[in-house]
Amino acid sequence: MRLTPELLVECYRRGLFPMAGPGGRVGLYRSDPRAVLELDALHVSKSLARVLRKGVYEVRIDQDFEAVIRACADREETWISEEIIRAFLGLHRRGLAHSVEAYDGEGRLAGGLYGVALGGAFFGESMFSRRPDASKVCLVRLVERLRERGYVLLDCQVQSPHLERMGAVEIPEAEFMRRLSEALRLDRAFA
């Protein structure tokens, strides 16, 4: 299987997401239960609220998508292969994959996240942080943007302690697929 932007779109519409295993071989996966972040249930800790109020980071959208996806892939164990990066860069060029980036006071990329926007759904793929709270700031700004633009679903795929602290919950796959179907009928613009 060769991962293309077109295949990625079809996968997301069917509730699948790509991951590369050892050696970079890409597979398509589902998660049951599925982690989602309800847009009205984001948990912002007091310390994160202070960081947001102080404006420690400048947040930008789609300023350097490739730097974000490569930073997300830059770990000892990663599921983001070169093939996945190429396919997502193609999606980004088509206006379907987006990044939210946090820059420090020196203008350096301090953290970010990326994902795919289809209809009224946003599929969060990965995030990274080089400085304290940078990826969390990006997640807060992402949720604000999705709310403002009328999105109804933020897919986090697989629950993690970090996402759980931010308010992500797990739902049965059948419920996720029902909600995904409803979200895909909407016409929303991320950019």
From Swiss-Prot:
A molecular-function term among this protein's GO annotations: leucyl-tRNA--protein transferase activity
Fetch the SUPFAM superfamilies from UniProt.
Acyl-CoA N-acyltransferases (Nat) (SSF55729)
Q: Name one GO biological process term.
A: protein catabolic process
EC number, UniProt record:
2.3.2.6
Q: What class of enzyme is it?
A: transferase
Q: Subcellular localization, per the record?
A: Cytoplasm
* Keyword annotations of the record: Acyltransferase, Cytoplasm, Transferase
The reply to whether Repeat figures as a keyword in the UniProt entry is no
Record-linked InterPro entries: Acyl_CoA_acyltransferase (IPR016181), Leu/Phe-tRNA_Trfase (IPR004616), Leu/Phe-tRNA_Trfase_C (IPR042203)
What superkingdom heads the lineage?
Bacteria
> One matching Pfam family, short form?
Leu_Phe_trans
Q: Which reaction does it catalyse?
A: N-terminal L-lysyl-[protein] + L-leucyl-tRNA(Leu) = N-terminal L-leucyl-L-lysyl-[protein] + tRNA(Leu) + H(+); N-terminal L-arginyl-[protein] + L-leucyl-tRNA(Leu) = N-terminal L-leucyl-L-arginyl-[protein] + tRNA(Leu) + H(+); L-phenylalanyl-tRNA(Phe) + an N-terminal L-alpha-aminoacyl-[protein] = an N-terminal L-phenylalanyl-L-alpha-aminoacyl-[protein] + tRNA(Phe)
Question: What is one GO cellular-component annotation here?
Answer: cytoplasm
Family according to the record? Belongs to the L/F-transferase family.
Query: What is the stated purpose of this protein?
Result: Functions in the N-end rule pathway of protein degradation where it conjugates Leu, Phe and, less efficiently, Met from aminoacyl-tRNAs to the N-termini of proteins containing an N-terminal arginine or lysine.
Q: What is this protein called?
A: Leucyl/phenylalanyl-tRNA--protein transferase
Species assigned in the record: Rubrobacter xylanophilus (strain DSM 9941 / JCM 11954 / NBRC 16129 / PRD-1)
Gene symbol?
Answer: aat
